[in-house]
Amino acid sequence: MGEFFKDADGKMPYNGLRDEKIPDNLRIVTAEEALTYVENYDGYYYSIEIKDSGYLGFKAADILYKILSDMNLIERVIVASFNKDVILYLEENYPDLHRTAYNIEAAGLFFDAVFGIDRPEGYYKFDILQVPPDKYIVNMGTSKLINHAHKNNVAVQYWTINDTERMIFLNNIGADGIITDIPNVAYEVLRLQDKG
């Protein structure tokens, strides 16, 4: 949750919190602390994003890989980054890590889907496409894209979906995951839909 997070009532409870106004229970935890905490409950799968580019992104990748390796979590983590340099660094240094597509790769898969271009097995070097369905000029939230991705062993996850009708639509066309600011609402909506 960031400073601009909105709760169900549209309020932003963390907006403007600085210095001594930040309560102790809002301390930022380390990746290792967060993973250890969640691992106490169940064997979840994770999507972890590296925000930095360049040297800091590479250093973050190195640290993250060590944590994941030490905790035996490599197979249950997808690493994401908007930075092509970080993605290429991951691919070169940690080929056993699962990763998302960077923007040019995502566009390539999209156009392959639209034009029905079949690629050889292993052509796509990424395991998951994490995209907004309609933020760009093109609509990425289609069954055609999802079906093409699945045919090539690529999962499709959409962000940031806070509209319940959109959640249902994406679920119905085969989306593998939905990133949302309201996971409790998404859980209930999709759970009820799956029952119905």
Predicted segments, located by residue:
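Metal-dependent phosphodiesterase/phospholipase catalytic core, i.e.
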Residues: 1-88, 92-93, 125-152
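C-terminal active-site rim and adjoining tail of enzyme catalytic domains
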Residues: 21, 109-196
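Active-site-proximal helices and loops of the catalytic beta/alpha 8
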Residues: 83, 95-98, 188
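Short, well-structured secondary-structure segments
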Residues: 47, 98-100, 157
